[in-house]
Amino acid sequence: MNIKRRLKYLTSCLLVSAFFWINSSAWAGGPEIPPSAPWVIYLGGFGGIYVANFEYQGTYLGGSFTVPIGSNVHQNGYTAGGHIGLRYYFSNPWFLGLEFAAMGNSENATTAESVLAPSPDDLIFNLVNQFRIKSNLDLTAQLGVNITPQTRVYIKGGASYARIRHILTVFNPATLTPTISLQRTTHKNRWGFLVGFGLGYDFCPWFGIFTEYNYYDYGRVGLDSLSNIRPNNGADTYHQNVRVHAYSVLLGVNLNFSV
């Protein structure tokens, strides 16, 4: 089991264990939750695991033949960012929240394909795609409850705006050492949605920690169609698209300001 899987497994176990422990102690005769300030503004930073899935589809039209291309690859990376938010206790201990977050994400997802003519021995070129969600901006609403004086659980959902980078590279296999005959980098800005849940704990009125799980879905993204991409400059067309979804597991800190 690699480090990222261990971190993901450990974080998930902590989330589940903490939830059930706090839930049992809070509702089984625990201390009465004192009134909270109606409004809480918070600033925070976080880091964690970020995994994006790219379901890539392409169609190569080579004149007299068609080659379908498809693969499913993952961006197994890390993320870091910050957020600012507002909680309103409309009926203590229940609260509504609004939050804006920004984060940057590491690593690439890479797929490599060989484009063949109808004859299995007729290799035309090798095609390599690299994908990466470089960053995303999230605006979410929250519904939560303080289950102890220091602890809260919540669900969240909203909109996410992602910047997706795509690098397409064509290699000419006819040479002794394959050479790059075409390389194209494009960026796509894409709206999507996210849903998630979290657990927060305040050590004192102004400082606390939190952990979250978030799921993102950006749908199917149309990529640029290209012409004449084969190394020998033959007439052809290449159509491509990719479906993008992701998840993150976060751990962070907050500074709280009661209003």
UniProtKB/Swiss-Prot annotation:
Provide this UniProt record's keywords sorted from A to Z.
Answer: Cell membrane, Membrane, Signal, Transmembrane, Transmembrane helix
- Membrane topology note: Multi-pass membrane protein
Q: Where are the transmembrane segments?
A: 32-52, 191-211
Which positions make up the signal peptide?
Answer: 1-28
Where it sits in the cell: the answer is:
Cell membrane
Q: Does the keyword Cytoplasm apply?
A: no
Q: Reply yes or no: does the keyword Repeat apply.
A: no
**Record-level GO cellular component terms:** plasma membrane
Pfam families (alphabetical): OMP_b-brl (PF13505)
Q: What is this protein called?
A: Uncharacterized protein CBU_1413
